[in-house]
Amino acid sequence: GGTSTEHKISIQTGFAVAEAIKGVHNLEMINLEKEIYQFPYNLLDSDLVFNALHGGDGENGTIQAYLDLHHVAYTGSDSKSSKIAMDKNLSKLIVQSVDILTPKWILIKIDPYTGIKLENYKTPQFPFPYVVKPSNEGSTYGLSIVHNESELPAAIGFAAEYSNEILIEEYIPGRELTVGILGNRTLPIIEIKPSHNLFDFECKYTKGMSKYIVPAELSDEMVWKISKDALRIYNTIGCRHYARADFGPTEFI
């Protein structure tokens, strides 16, 4: 489960993985509810750790670095690429550096003790609406859509409950596309159609709240471009084994 806000989601993933591989391998499920310094030592005798943790130490490179230190094999990306991929600001900078389009954004850093912004806050140089979200959270925790200046302080405060680094990003309405990568091969692109205007926590994890179209109805050219860009991101960050990349509306891509 882990100690992150996505504890319950991690447990769901763990049970799904266990169901998929039971009878094929000797399996021990471990519900990690403690800090990293209380990591279960019996895990260090494993041939392979299948990391099913979402968010926090499970995705930000901490668990990965711990397992590397003890020479334990594990699934997923290494500590360096995990840290990069979990940091939305850093990953967007890397995506931008290889000429892949990403929505415009600014980063706000906040002192965790005083709540004072550590950098001079400048109004974003793009029009409303904005997406305001923590820079290192998943499952849309702390995320808000802001339509005008008066809504911005509350949205920043909400995001600050989850992180001291907050992204204010331009909101681009349109299709929600995601592409999985396994090994060094892209999987069929999925289009997600949530019941709400936003693919929020409820739509992600409540049965029947979203429709998934597989494969997404896209031109061959668009499939090629999205798949190519997903692999470029994957390889540039240095991911391994598996990953997923989300893309906005095809008009933007």
Where are the predicted features?
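Active-site nucleotide/adenylate-binding loops and adjacent lid/helix of ATP-dependent enzymes
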Residues: 1, 43-44, 84-169, 173-175
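Phosphate-binding site of ATP-dependent enzymes
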Residues: 147-228, 250
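Conserved metal-phosphate-binding beta-hairpin within the catalytic cores
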Residues: 170, 181, 234-253
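ATP-binding N-terminal substructure of ATP-dependent carboxylate-amine bond-forming enzymes
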Residues: 1-93, 97, 109-120
